[in-house]
Regions:
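Nucleotide-activated donor-dependent transferases that construct or modify glycoconjugates
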Residues: 2-14
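Conserved nucleotide-sugar donor-interacting segment of glycosyltransferase catalytic cores
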Residues: 97-156
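A nucleotide-sugar donor-handling region in carbohydrate enzymes
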Residues: 141-220
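A donor-sugar binding/catalytic signature common to diverse glycosyltransferases
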Residues: 109-114, 258-285
Length: 285
């Protein structure tokens, strides 16, 4: 008997889109273990595996670029436009190739966070396309002016054809989507006992004096770590492998741990903030 198949297409911009979609896919696996999950993204497999505990197919494809950034704060509009233009010049080939993949693998539903081309691909294959996000890329690119006008129009044409939008909290209106349902926050759940993790990481500071520093998959080029020396009675946690060796800075280097796993140890999170980090912190309040 054929397994129901869900194809999840994610913008490969940072880690946030992959994380929140992986959280949804994980819940689908819990509720409907017979569903086959296909994760279509250039995000690394180790990231997906940190949220998806059961087997899935990782298809390394990209249908958009999000925003090209040097780090979590510095955006490169020129490089973004160049890469988007290249993708849309290949649009017909991308749609043909991936819609064939959907048909050949008997995919039942496409869930997109939130590449617009995924809608066109799904409909070419004759299956519905649902989107999930708190913003659309048209919302981001529109303020970047005339150079992006053609791309914005193409994105909005596809978004307007989506069968359903699952609109996350903290959202822009997303009025281009004709059918919307507001949903709750996405995010992972901590997987380790708080006291065990505190001992494992050597955290001795109380929770109200422990801060998680996290800047998503794109990181930050120049985190002023030296400033932490002014707070010797505070403990800071970071996943940055380039972080210096400071007495009050703990580097979490084991990939088994995710930011959400160490949040229960912390009274504060210092971030940019990205949606997934912010959502996971809010879910733990």
């Amino acid at each position: 008997m054929k397994r129901p198949t869900l194809y999840c297409a994610m913008t490969g911009h940072g880690f946030g889109h992959a994380v929140r979609t992986a959280c949804i896919a994980h819940r689908v696996q819990q509720l409907c273990p017979e569903v086959l999950i296909i994760m279509a993204t250039r995000s690394p497999r180790w990231l997906l595996e940190s949220y998806l505990e059961k087997p899935f197919i990782h298809r390394s494809v990209a249908f958009d670029v999000g925003v090209i950034q040097a780090d979590s704060l510095q955006m490169d509009q020129g490089a973004t436009l160049a890469q988007l233009t290249q993708i849309y010049q290949q649009k017909n080939r991308l749609i043909a190739t991936e819609s064939n993949y959907l048909r050949n693998n008997q995919v039942d539903l496409v869930l997109a966070d939130i590449p617009a081309l995924a809608v066109a691909i799904a409909h070419r294959a004759g299956i519905p396309a649902w989107c999930v996000s708190n913003f659309g890329w048209n919302f981001i690119y529109r303020d970047w002016g005339e150079p992006f006008a053609e791309i914005v129009a193409a994105i909005e044409k596809d978004y307007a054809q989506a069968d359903l939008l699952l609109r996350l909290p903290l959202a822009e209106p997303m009025a281009i989507f004709p059918n919307q349902v507001d949903v709750g926050l996405t995010g992972g759940d901590p997987r380790f006992a708080e006291q065990d993790l505190r001992q494992k990481l050597g955290i001795t500071a109380p929770k109200d004096r422990t801060i998680l520093l996290t800047f998503g998959g794109l990181g930050l080029q120049a985190i002023p770590y030296d400033g932490l020396k002014a707070f010797p009675d505070w403990q800071f946690l970071t996943f940055d492998r380039q972080a210096p060796n400071l007495p009050n800075l703990t580097q979490v280097s084991d990939q088994v741990y995710r930011p959400v796993d160490v949040m229960p140890l912390c009274g504060r999170v210092m971030s940019k903030p990205g949606f997934s980090t912010f959502a996971e912190a809010l879910r733990l309040e």
